């Protein structure tokens, strides 16, 4: 694992599909099944936020997971901060503060991971140097 667990999980959460199509036609899955790699990445990141971006806060696992999920969701599918706060039983300002901390942390990791991948591809002459 050249990038490390943190970067790997961030990239998995960003780019892996959260669901796969399911052709079983059973009512239990509604035509799609969850991607275990994506689910595991979200869980890993949610746990990691406890000792990093949300260290020293009272954010429990549900709040951390909601923040991580919200960060990676497409804007059109994203719940508002008010909805997030209501679902987690916290006030809107606290939800906004937690989201801001999580987003800033993940953006730094994503940027570092992209740079590392770009450098590796350049070293292998897969892409040209900028």
Residue ranges, per PLM feature:
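DNA major-groove recognition helix of helix-turn-helix
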Residues: 15, 98-106, 110
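Intrinsically disordered, low-complexity basic tails/linkers immediately adjacent to helix-turn-helix/homeobox/MYB/SANT
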Residues: 112-130
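Alpha-helix boundary/capping detector
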Residues: 25, 37, 110-111, 121
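Short basic alpha-helical hairpin corresponding to helix-turn-helix/winged-helix-like nucleic-acid-binding
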Residues: 1-77, 81-83
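Short alpha-helical "recognition helix" segments of helix-turn-helix
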Residues: 80-90, 95
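Charged, solvent-exposed alpha-helical segments that act as regulatory interaction surfaces
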Residues: 20, 24, 108-111, 115
